[in-house]
Amino acid sequence: MGEYIMEKNTIILGIETSCDETAVAVVKNGTEIIANVVASQIESHKRFGGVVPEIASRHHVEEITVVLEEALKEANITFDDIDAIAVTEGPGLVGALLIGVNAAKAVAFAHDIPLVGVHHIAGHIYANRLVKEVQFPLLSLVVSGGHTELVYMKEHGSFEVIGETRDDAAGEAYDKVARTLSMPYPGGPHIDRLAHEGKPTIDLPRAWLEPDSYDFSFSGLKSAVINTVHNAKQRGIEIAPEDLAASFQESVIDVLVTKASRAADAYNVKQVLLAGGVAANKGLRARLEAEFAQKENVELIIPPLSLCTDNAAMIAAAGTIAYEQGKRATLALNANPGLDIEA
């Protein structure tokens, strides 16, 4: 069959509203960002210490049309130039997802444009293709607020979850520990910053689980941090928050990097891709770089910070592959908060 040559440029409009970002992007050929607009709601959720689904949905309703128009203007295109619309159908908050799905269906119907549903985590993985062409087989370490998993891919559009969290996602643990240390939401960046000022002097558990397991568990670690703080308060002992942050972060990163490294060897992959919101963590990025610098036959790809947190360019990138593989959604497409990436 020879090399696959694209006859014309494929222009995909991506829409992402799975949590607290209203995002619309335009991507060319699955690799080049033409427009990438994100309206964040962090300020609205800050005082509640987490995302409030009802508030998130209302914001999406207010923002979606504005963000959509802004993306088209930034890309300097009209709906006639778009080959397909890719939208996050799940997983996420059902009310939030529905706003994006309904907006995508309305545009697809009004302008007679093909529609493609995208898995949110597939989007995070394909954010890496906006940095560099991916090579198979590959392994993706997905670390976000709701997900922590190792995903093996032997080809485009094929996802095998070889390891996942059995309880809390790494991002959840970060937010809960941040709350224990009275830090504002979202906690991840605050812990990361504080960790760099401290030393990992506090002995905290690492959940390795069974010897051959690639699964993760962070609830024990989270409880250990909360108990350490609680016990110190009861005994009137002062614990340096930066040392606690450094100890917690080292425990999380140790397990993530060790398991990713072991899986990369076992599955003989060509590339390891970092994906998800926690991929913005400086400590994690540095440790992965150090680990994979020692492996000559494995290339590590880490997306820029702007592509780690939720955005629609990654949804358009994943949607390009689905579109080229002939996948189409009908106007019956619905939000699916529990969508399985392997389905």
From Swiss-Prot:
GO biological process, one term: tRNA threonylcarbamoyladenosine modification
NCBIfam families the record matches: gcp_kae1 (TIGR00329), T6A_TsaD_YgjD (TIGR03723)
Keyword list, A-Z: Acyltransferase, Cytoplasm, Iron, Metal-binding, Transferase, tRNA processing
UniProt-listed Enzyme Commission number(s): 2.3.1.234
GO CC terms: cytoplasm
Matches recorded under PROSITE patterns: GLYCOPROTEASE (PS01016)
Function text: Required for the formation of a threonylcarbamoyl group on adenosine at position 37 (t(6)A37) in tRNAs that read codons beginning with adenine. Is involved in the transfer of the threonylcarbamoyl moiety of threonylcarbamoyl-AMP (TC-AMP) to the N6 group of A37, together with TsaE and TsaB. TsaD likely plays a direct catalytic role in this reaction.
Species of the source: Bacillus thuringiensis (strain Al Hakam)
Cofactor(s) needed for function: Fe(2+)
Entry note: cofactor: Binds 1 Fe(2+) ion per subunit.
Residues binding substrate: V142, V143, S144, G145, G146, D175, G188, D192, N281
Name listed for the protein in its UniProt record: tRNA N6-adenosine threonylcarbamoyltransferase
PANTHER family in alphabetical order: TRNA N6-ADENOSINE THREONYLCARBAMOYLTRANSFERASE, TRNA N6-ADENOSINE THREONYLCARBAMOYLTRANSFERASE, MITOCHONDRIAL
